[in-house]
Amino acid sequence: MVKRLSNRMVFKDKAPLEVDVIVFSAGIRPQDELARQAELEVGERGGIVINNQCQTSDENIYAIGECALWGQKIFGLVAPGYTMARTTADVLTGMPSEGFK
């Protein structure tokens, strides 16, 4: 728990810290070990490379969500994962699909 007071923060343990600015950053690291073992293409910094249909470098294997790398981007949000899931479902069932964008 952090409490903000003008140019000072006071942490839960009551320790103060004088600040001009606070930057908070969080990130994700894709879990792609299985893809590496399967010799699928993965990005330099991780993530299973997919195309617009969410296919990996093996056209019979799909990847969606935080493990997927599309356009050199990893999406740490749930909404892109839902869109990838819809795209994959459409492709697998032969439905028209604009692909993941």
PLM features: what roles do these ranges have?
Residues 2-10, 15-90:
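FAD-site-proximal beta/loop scaffold in flavoenzymes
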Residues 41-45, 95-101:
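A short alpha-helix-loop-beta-strand transition element characteristic
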